[in-house]
Curated annotation (Swiss-Prot):
This protein's name: Tryptophan synthase alpha chain
Pathway named in the protein's UniProt entry: Amino-acid biosynthesis; L-tryptophan biosynthesis; L-tryptophan from chorismate: step 5/5
Lineage: Bacteria, Pseudomonadati, Pseudomonadota, Gammaproteobacteria, Pasteurellales
EC number: 4.2.1.20
Keywords carried by this UniProt record: Amino-acid biosynthesis, Aromatic amino acid biosynthesis, Lyase, Tryptophan biosynthesis
Active site: E49 (proton acceptor), D60 (proton acceptor)
CDD domains in UniProt: Tryptophan_synthase_alpha
Disulfide cross-links: none
Catalytic activity: (1S,2R)-1-C-(indol-3-yl)glycerol 3-phosphate + L-serine = D-glyceraldehyde 3-phosphate + L-tryptophan + H2O
Task performed by this protein: The alpha subunit is responsible for the aldol cleavage of indoleglycerol phosphate to indole and glyceraldehyde 3-phosphate.
Pfam families: Trp_syntA
UniProt-listed NCBIfam families: trpA
Length: 269
């Protein structure tokens, strides 16, 4: 089984959900970013969703856009990101690692080169935010060739045909978007039809469902699990902690540890 498959099987046996934090790699720099990831894992992160710095992140709101800019301003590239992933994998051989990024970062080195680097560094799954399921065949084939699981977003307006395509192609986990728009910890609303979407995904035998966008409080994690999700992803809330503590790594790591601990605790019944 893959690391994600093993994780969800183990959590199901314990009647727990998954808490998955998102951060942009190399924000605010390489060494501090690695310490941030160590803190996430030490305080209960079940898996990691990692972004590569990019100049035009399509799904991201202002908070994660700023994280991308900090990393880019520091001169950090895709090479540095793969170097960090290899370092994470060396220290944490069991933690599932997923990437969330834009197609440009996959196309530029060629898909074969990109997914080969993913495999070599220890990536488990890749979600390409701006590639819809209908246009995904060449990506999924390249990923599969290198043993990388393909993850797709299920939007809140997905019809049954789209849901079935997502369920058929997605491996590792299904990213259920809480609402339309971009990432934000402030906008914590979610679409009214999420329960129906979750039921439809499960009827279509989808990969385990993680709800993302606007997840910033333990109550929202509990709500996602109550709706039938297998866990929740939190990104903007975590990146905001980084942003407001750029002058104190000690305070940053302390605040981050507390946040992750309470969010993970919310996954336990």
């Amino acid at each position: 089984m893959s690391r994600f498959d093993t994780l969800f099987a183990n959590l199901k046996a314990k009647n727990e959900g998954a808490f998955v934090p998102f951060v942009t790699l190399c924000d605010p720099d390489f060494d501090r970013s690695f310490e941030i990831i160590e803190t996430l894992i030490a305080n209960g992160a079940d898996a990691l969703e990692l972004g590569f710095p990019f100049s035009d992140p399509l799904l991201d709101g202002s908070v994660i856009q700023a994280a991308n800019k900090r990393a880019l301003d520091g001169g950090y590239s895709t090479d540095a990101c793969f170097e960090m992933i290899a370092k994470i994998r060396s220290k944490y051989p069991e933690i599932p690692i997923g990437l969330l990024l834009c197609a440009n970062l996959v196309f530029v080195p060629t898909q074969c080169v990109f997914f080969n680097r993913c495999a070599e560094s220890g990536v488990d799954a890749v979600l390409i935010a701006d590639v819809p399921v209908l246009a995904s065949e060449e990506f999924t084939q390249a990923a599969k060739k290198h043993g990388i699981q393909s993850v797709f977003i299920c939007p809140p307006n997905a019809d049954q045909v789209t849901i079935e395509r997502i369920a058929n192609l997605t491996e590792g986990y299904t990213y259920l978007v809480s609402r339309s728009g971009v990432t934000s910890a402030e906008n914590q609303a979610h679409a009214k039809n999420l329960d129906n979407l979750i039921e439809s995904l499960k009827r279509s035998n989808s990969a385990p469902i993680l709800q993302g966008f606007g997840i910033a409080k333990p109550a929202q994690v509990k709500e996602a699990l109550a709706l039938g999700c297998d866990g929740a992803i939190s990104g903007s809330a975590i990146v905001k902690i980084i942003e407001r503590n750029l002058d104190s790594q000690t305070q940053l790591l302390s605040e981050l540890a507390k946040f992750v601990s309470v969010m993970k605790a919310a996954t336990k019944s």
